[in-house]
Design a protein with these regions (language model features):
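Polar, enzyme-active/binding microenvironments
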Residues: 1-175
């Protein structure tokens, strides 16, 4: 079944996703137009209960690539990324209301290519690549309070990049 299309067919490379029970959010990182790729700051959304094309939501505070997202019931969060250097930035949107992303705080390190997940109250970013090397470190934010992330622990195994994460109310998994 065809759900719909993104607003620009060339968007989609490196998108991270989040949302709520009613909206799906796409935070894009690259526009792939032959022969070049451009880093972008585009946010789009779909209404999950109905088919149709994605609509413009707003923009990230800065264009970046290889960032990751997690969501609470009311907000979607973007962590890190590159453009061209690594970022410590955490941004958020209020999922139910269109508009531009806002600054939330910073990760403890500049990083990209990791994975994020969360539950209703907490988001966790782990893995990826920081300035030194691949990392297995995890850090957390409390969704309700603007501020910086704090160290949370490590994911099992040596550092990895281009990984995925999924979670429910009590556990997060990285692979």
């Amino acid at each position: 079944i065809d759900f719909g299309n993104l607003t620009a067919q060339s968007l989609g490379f490196g998108a991270s996703t989040g949302g709520s029970e009613t909206r799906g959010i796409f935070m894009f990182s690259m526009q792939s137009s032959s022969p070049t790729r451009t880093v972008v700051d585009v946010i789009e959304f779909v209404t999950i209960s109905q088919t149709g094309n994605a609509l413009d939501f707003g923009n990230l505070t800065a264009a970046s690539q290889t960032h990751q997202c997690s969501s609470s019931p009311t907000r979607t969060f973007k962590y890190g990324g590159f453009n061209p250097s690594r970022s410590k930035g955490i941004e958020f949107i209020t999922t139910a209301t269109t508009g531009n992303a806002q600054d939330f705080g910073d990760l403890t390190r500049a990083v990209g290519r990791g994975a994020a997940c969360g539950n209703a109250t907490r988001g966790i970013y782990a893995g990826g690549e920081d300035d030194a090397a691949l990392t297995d470190e995890a850090e957390k934010i409390e969704y309700a309070t603007l501020g910086n992330a704090v160290e949370f622990g490590d994911v099992v195994g040596s550092g990895r990049e281009y990984i995925s994460a999924v979670s429910n109310r009590v556990r997060g998994l990285w692979s």
